[in-house]
Curated annotation (Swiss-Prot):
InterPro entries: Beta-prop_DCAF12, DCAF12, WD40/YVTN_repeat-like_dom_sf, WD40_repeat_CS, WD40_repeat_dom_sf, WD40_rpt. This is DDB1- and CUL4-associated factor 12-A. It is found in: Cytoplasm; Cytoplasm, Cytoskeleton, Microtubule organizing center, Centrosome; Nucleus. Belongs to the WD repeat DCAF12 family. SUPFAM superfamilies: WD40 repeat-like. Residues 1-12 have a biased composition (Basic residues). GO terms for molecular function: ubiquitin-like ligase-substrate adaptor activity. The keyword Plastid does not apply. It comes from the Eukaryota. WD repeats lie at residues 132-173, 177-215, 245-284, 333-370. GO terms for biological process: protein ubiquitination; regulation of autophagy; ubiquitin-dependent protein catabolic process via the C-end degron rule pathway. Substrate-recognition component of a DCX (DDB1-CUL4-X-box) E3 ubiquitin-protein ligase complex of the DesCEND (destruction via C-end degrons) pathway, which recognizes a C-degron located at the extreme C terminus of target proteins, leading to their ubiquitination and degradation. The C-degron recognized by the DesCEND pathway is usually a motif of less than ten residues and can be present in full-length proteins, truncated proteins or proteolytically cleaved forms.
Length: 446
């Protein structure tokens, strides 16, 4: 008896509706299924600790599974930051230290094991700042690829300050470039960084060997911190696409290291793409599908996608595709805005102005659900997984007394969040969303 051959062709997926990104190709990102016993989070942590496996594919599978599983079991530990006002930026320095920048222009390091806060001296311009200058604080902290230099804002929020890692000794200040606040910074190589300013320009700064070695020599001769002053290598204005040029402010930057391309978001609702190597050359500008309150941007290298936050949506842009192919997801946080966004494996983490953390699965194209029903905000099992920040600290100032004293709890906007290198710890920080309120929040979710 002959055995009949059976066709196992898969049925084609139905076409997507208008505005849906039907051409997302997930075949390149299909992963082998793990055996049931190896899907355990405990197994992942044990294997990471013992490191018996050298197979990068296997470790990639484990990291992907952990990224999807961890959010539902994270628990919060708050840190007390005193009377600091609104944490705008943060980066992990190592497995136990996170560096942060605030609206009150304070740069500090928090030890996530002890909760100890250490303040870092702010670097000043070569010329004193005008006394009438109002500081907006530190909005950006970025570390170069080799993790040897850290770039952030200076005492003058229009200037870029660079520190050496891991010591946080000062290296240089880039001043005289922008005439308004720096909102974002991106490293495009180990020695070159780009700053995006509220004046609508992007500055290219180079930390040459001469500058770095000079600061080394000066530190050896003096007990007082000394540093160099550098000028921009290039200064480019973003295109004034809108009818209101006042809104042409560079709000966020993200770098694609594979293609050497720099994405920029401006407050007039446009996404700009630049070739970023030894200089900046414009490639394209496109209107965003949702163009209100575009204040955060991230790039997912594995997915070749930019994620842009707006008032109530996260939009995913692939510069290789026509603008109408952009996919946007509604975050159910209308009115408060998306304040921070990041990629980790196939999960996009979203921080909102209402103090919520949401987790979007790019492969499944949906938000993670609460599989346990134990989440603080979940009404029932299967609801969208939402983690809510703690109370933090709030100054009961005149603004609060006049306008917010009848509110039981003022939520803390998630202005910044970042995963550690293992992907098992999530640092989250921010403060009250209303401009006149003074307060802070910082917590470790692990």
């Amino acid at each position: 008896m002959t055995r009949r051959s059976v066709s196992r062709k898969r049925r084609a997926n139905p076409g997507s509706g208008p505005g849906e990104q039907s051409d997302w190709d997930h075949s390149a990102h299909k992963r082998k299924r793990l055996p049931p016993e190896k899907k355990s989070l405990v197994f992942y942590l044990k294997s990471r600790e013992l490191k018996p496996h050298n197979d990068s594919t296997y470790l990639h599978l484990l990291r992907g599974h952990a990224a999807c599983t961890l959010p539902s079991i994270l628990s919060e530990r708050e840190f007390h930051l005193g009377n600091l006002n609104k944490v705008f930026a943060s980066q992990w320095l190592n497995h136990r230290q996170v560096v942060c920048g605030t609206k009150c222009n304070t740069l500090f390091v928090v030890d996530v094991q002890t909760g100890q806060i250490t303040r870092i001296p702010i670097l000043k311009d070569r010329e004193p700042i005008n006394g009438s200058h109002q500081s907006c604080g530190i909005h950006a902290i970025e570390i170069n690829p080799s993790r040897t230099l850290l770039a952030t804002g200076g005492d003058n929020p229009n200037s870029i300050a660079v520190y050496r890692l891991p010591t946080l000794d000062p290296v240089c200040v880039g001043d005289g470039g922008h005439n308004d606040w720096i909102f974002s910074i991106a490293w495009i190589s180990d020695t070159m960084a780009v700053s995006g300013s509220r004046d609508g320009s992007m500055g290219l700064w180079e930390m040459t060997d001469e500058v770095v070695n000079k600061s080394d020599f000066q530190h050896g001769l003096s007990r007082v911190p000394v540093y160099s002053h550098i000028s921009h290598k290039a200064l480019k204005d973003i295109p004034k696409e809108s009818s209101n040029p006042v809104n042409c402010k560079v709000r966020a930057l993200a770098f694609n290291s594979n293609n050497k391309e720099l994405g920029a978001v401006s407050l007039d609702g446009f996404f700009h793409l630049w070739k970023a190597e030894q200089t900046l050359s414009k490639l394209l500008s496109t209107k965003l599908p949702y163009c209100r309150e575009n204040v955060c941007l991230a790039y997912g290298l594995e997915w070749s996608l930019y994620a842009v936050g707006s008032q109530a949506h996260v939009s995913f842009l692939d510069p290789r595709q026509p603008p109408h192919c952009a996919k946007s997801v509604y975050c159910r946080e209308q009115g408060s805005g998306i304040r921070s966004v990041s990629f980790y494996e196939h999960i996009v983490t979203v921080g909102t102005g209402q103090g919520a953390l949401l987790f979007y699965d790019i492969r499944a194209q949906r938000f993670l659900e609460d599989s346990t029903g134990n989440c603080r905000n979940a009404k029932k099992k299967g609801d969208t997984l939402k983690l809510s920040t703690g109370k933090g600290w709030l100054n009961h100032n005149e603004m609060w007394l006049n306008y917010f004293s009848d509110i039981d709890c003022c939520p803390n906007a998630v202005y910044t969040h970042c995963y550690d290198s293992s992907g098992t710890k999530l640092f989250v920080a921010g403060g009250p969303l209303p401009t006149g309120l003074h307060g802070n929040y910082a917590g470790l979710w692990s």
